Amino acid sequence: AIVSTDSYNYFGRDESFLDKKLLPFVKSSGYIYIAIPGMKKDCHDKLPPELLLSWTPKQLEYMHDVKYWTDMVSKCAGAEVISVNEMESNGEVWADWLKQDNEYAVGDRKSMEAGGGKYLNFISIVLRKK
């Protein structure tokens, strides 16, 4: 199995990434588990001002909704999509992240304190190699 936490959204937006770069390292019928920050609904056409308190439009290009990620991983020829869902632990995950003292978590607090959390979630993706 491969487990990816809080990183797949950076490189997984390339449609060929799963088939070419990740699946060669997974045995037949093996699993890929992905957890990434995302948006409840893509709003890149009109980014809410709350989100722009912490992130630039370019930084937000890495965050998408469940539909986007479902469409993206469904293009993979070598894996079966088991599930793509908003994580039930969304609020808890964000709260844990914001408690961290690293510069990124501290910077994210501005948006979340202004109500940006209503636009964001965490997404779980489970795939099985064919």
What does each model-identified segment do?
Residues 3:
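A conserved beta-strand element that flanks and buttresses the S-adenosyl-L-methionine
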Residues 15-31:
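A short glycine-rich, Lys/Arg-flanked "PGG" loop and its adjoining helix->strand segment in the class I
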